[in-house]
Design a protein with these regions (language model features):
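Active-site-proximal or metal-binding-adjacent scaffold patches in catalytic folds
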Residues: 1-198, 207-248
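Walker B catalytic acidic pair
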Residues: 203
Length: 248
């Protein structure tokens, strides 16, 4: 029996340490117990190499309470979506309003601030707003994909949306005459248009180049110029995009 006794925890269990959420995780490829901050989920992950050592991971997390508190304090606040809020969608300021009927995007005839109108309150309202944002994301990202694919002389790929935690887009090259497949994070709609467009160009370049070699980056630069500012923006603000739609 280990120093920490029989396993008292399960993979995926959650603890609270220093007021912060800590998730226990088994990773059989890990060599030791460790802690890391997951900024996209707003939590700390305590990893153990086996189920038997999860208790050790939990004890390690409790022993590092001060570190956990300091790191979690650096995270952007969780941002709910409520009537009266103003958010940016592809860099445009958008107002959120409560209204009866189907959730929808409204472009005022006078050219003023667009509005997302949705029913409900609390999480129900937020879910309805996110559906509208996803529809905008699908439309804009598909348009930009068609634009960049045409510039590259590549066939228009199949487009999908998801909510991945570790990447903003992914590309599977087409084989044997079949179209490629590109999936984007819907949260790109919450980034400036130029940043989202860079991600589209990046994934479209993968329709021709599977790696990140010089030819790949030359394709990207031809479409959107220097990618460095856009990559830096995502590193600096990516965690904030994942905080949207999460109650504070």
């Amino acid at each position: 029996m280990s120093l920490f006794g029989r396993a008292q925890h399960a993979d995926g269990d959650r603890l609270t340490v220093a007021g912060a959420p800590v998730r226990l995780k088994v990773n059989t490829r890990a060599r030791r117990v460790s802690l890391r901050l997951d900024p996209t989920r707003g939590e700390v992950v305590a990893t153990a190499p086996s189920l038997r050592r999860l208790a050790e991971a939990a004890a390690f997390a409790n022993a590092r309470a001060a570190w956990i508190a300091s790191r979690v304090a650096e995270l952007p606040p969780r941002q709910g979506l409520a009537p009266g809020d103003r958010i940016e969608v592809f860099g445009r300021l958008v107002r959120l309003e409560a209204a009866d009927g189907r959730a929808r995007w409204v472009e005022p005839a006078d050219g003023s601030t667009p509005v997302i109108r949705a029913m409900g309150d609390g999480e129900g309202f937020a879910r309805a707003v996110i559906l509208v944002i996803k529809a905008q994301a699908r439309r804009v990202l598909a348009e930009r994909t068609a634009h960049h694919a045409a510039r590259l002389g590549a066939a228009m790929p199949t487009i999908g949306l998801g909510d991945p935690r570790a990447r903003w887009g992914s590309c599977r090259m087409g084989r044997g005459g079949a179209a490629g497949v590109i999936r984007y994070s819907w949260r790109l709609a919450l980034a400036p248009f130029e940043v989202a467009d860079y991600v589209v160009a990046h994934e479209c370049a993968h329709l021709l180049e599977a790696n990140h070699g010089p030819r790949f980056w030359s394709h990207v630069a031809a479409m959107v110029g220097d990618p460095a500012p856009h990559r830096a923006w995502l590193r600096a603000h990516g965690a904030r995009l994942h905080a949207f739609g999460q109650p504070g």
